[in-house]
Amino acid sequence: MNKPSDNISVQILVSTIRVEGLRRLAKSSLPLAPWLSYLVGCQRGGDSPESIGREFERLFGNRCDVSLKIYDTFGLSVSRNSLKSETTGVVMIFIADDVALDAGALAYVRDYFASHGEVDVVKTRIRINGRFIGGDKPRCVRRNRWRGEYAVANALAMRRNSLDGLAFCPCLGVGAARYLSGEDDIFFTQVLEKGLRVEYLPVEMAVHNGQSTAERFHSPGVLLARGLVLAYVHPHTWPVHAALLAARVEGSGWWRNFRTIARGASELKDIAELRRR
């Protein structure tokens, strides 16, 4: 007899750039399972399509569950949107090329989708600098204008059919011209604004082995983006959140950090553009 989970396929959407990115991915943990597949979006970054194709075949030629798309575009959000438009999985998860996946946690999340047809998105626990964030109990996630709800993409498993009309903002994230983070926060906030059913599960699907946004928080491009996100999520109370955030960031001093965050929060045209998306 077939189980409900037999109808749930999971596709991991991997954004990377150049041949070096494929090599990083090959060193990561990519579990094998009959219901699991991987779609790799490799932005050329100056490398030829032929060299990328040859390296992919060398590294993953024996993996029929891993497929490749080569893009001439640039920017993490742009790559994710392209992958989202091409995924075939019932459930999709976005990851970077240096993320290690946990097979047991992926199976648990898949089974949860199978037995909870009303759930659109599962948010899982994340680890930042060795510290777990998210809590130890399952819960329904709702938007809270004071506290906010934030997420990272590799801790979100999402039903493909629930995400119509949603996309990552190309002006945010690695490779963007000005705002070098914030793409996950805005995307997830818009998931909640759309009224999708989001459940939190205290499992860890993925571990990010590379440099995280938290580790480059002092970068002006990241702080600008944090200000933009704070003004979007907390339009009336963002100065309080900005002051608290500035105190936690090491490197440039509280006042300089606060000024940079406030500049991002004051970009009313960009914030209005996000609200129109």
Regions found by a protein language model. Give the residues of each.
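Non-catalytic, C-terminal membrane-associated alpha-helical segments of glycosyltransferases
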Residues: H218-R277
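Acidic donor-binding segment of Leloir-type glycosyltransferases
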Residues: A26-I70
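Acidic donor-binding loop at a coil-to-helix junction in glycosyltransferase catalytic cores
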Residues: G173-F187
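Short beta-strand-to-loop acidic/aromatic patch adjacent to the donor-nucleotide binding site
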Residues: V90-A100
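N-proximal low-complexity "stem/linker" segments adjacent to membrane-targeting elements
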Residues: M1-S37
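Conserved donor NDP-sugar-binding/catalytic core segment of glycosyltransferases
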Residues: G104-D136
